[in-house]
């Protein structure tokens, strides 16, 4: 169960959540092109239905660049992804994308772009490990993430077809904030992410903020999605907690 405590010393409670969403647009995502578009759009829809203000920033990345589609847009007004705005290509510059976007968000915070008690949620979704970064490496990104955790930022990592905890720990991700999923079950992963995001925002709307320990257990209160087919045959993917390895989508034969 998520732990929380009340916000004191303020006559009003901010219900603003700023979500920085970092989405892999590399060539391997071509296999789940439409699923990724649909899953992201459903995530947007689900968060539109929640109370409070949600500011969404979307950045896509591959070796051609780290491209920010929009920053701090009211989630009620953002454009959906489609095959024109999301076009997978090239290799994975994951660390460069994380480092650049932390710097960009940090600059906006320093400039006073947000209420002082805004909740910052930094979501990273990829189906591959870094193989093309030039500006940042895992150790450099880890230092940046650890620093921002002390300021109350929450970092979440979703990795397809990999051990998300094993990969994520190399650059500072907490076990409870990582999730492994089958690439063919993007919808299930997005559903779980949305449930956890809703719980996170719900605490804010009640005048609560996550404790230090709870901020590293992001998926604790997320709903478990229904089984959804992965790419091949009659194999199905379901989300299951995996002690010591964050949350994991494991596959099993349908009965």
Language-model regions, residue ranges each:
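Acidic, low-complexity intrinsically disordered regions
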Residues: 1-255
């Amino acid at each position: 169960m998520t732990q929380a405590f009340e916000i004191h010393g303020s006559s009003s409670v901010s219900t603003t959540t700023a979500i920085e969403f970092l989405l892999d647009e590399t060539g391997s995502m071509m296999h789940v092109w439409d699923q990724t578009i649909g899953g992201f759009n459903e995530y947007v829809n689900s968060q539109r239905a929640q109370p409070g203000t949600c500011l969404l920033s979307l950045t896509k990345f591959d070796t051609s660049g780290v491209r920010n589609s929009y920053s701090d847009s009211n989630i009620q007004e953002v454009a959906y992804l489609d095959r024109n705005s999301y076009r997978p290509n090239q290799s994975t510059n994951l660390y460069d994308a994380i480092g650049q976007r932390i710097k960009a968000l940090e600059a906006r915070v320093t400039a006073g772009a947000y209420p002082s008690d805004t909740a910052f949620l930094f979501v990273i979704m990829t189906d591959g490990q870094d193989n093309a970064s030039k500006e940042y490496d895992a150790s450099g990104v880890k230092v940046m993430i650890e620093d921002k955790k002390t300021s109350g930022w929450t970092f979440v990592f979703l990795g397809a077809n990999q051990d998300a905890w094993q990969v994520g720990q190399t650059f500072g991700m907490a076990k409870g904030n990582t999730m492994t999923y089958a690439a063919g079950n993007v919808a299930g992963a997005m559903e779980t992410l949305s449930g956890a995001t809703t719980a996170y925002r719900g605490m804010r709307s009640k005048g609560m903020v996550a404790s230090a320990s709870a901020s590293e257990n992001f998926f604790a209160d997320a709903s478990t999605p229904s089984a959804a087919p992965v790419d091949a045959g009659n194999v199905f993917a379901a989300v299951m907690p995996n002690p010591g390895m964050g949350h994991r989508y494991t596959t099993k034969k349908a009965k």
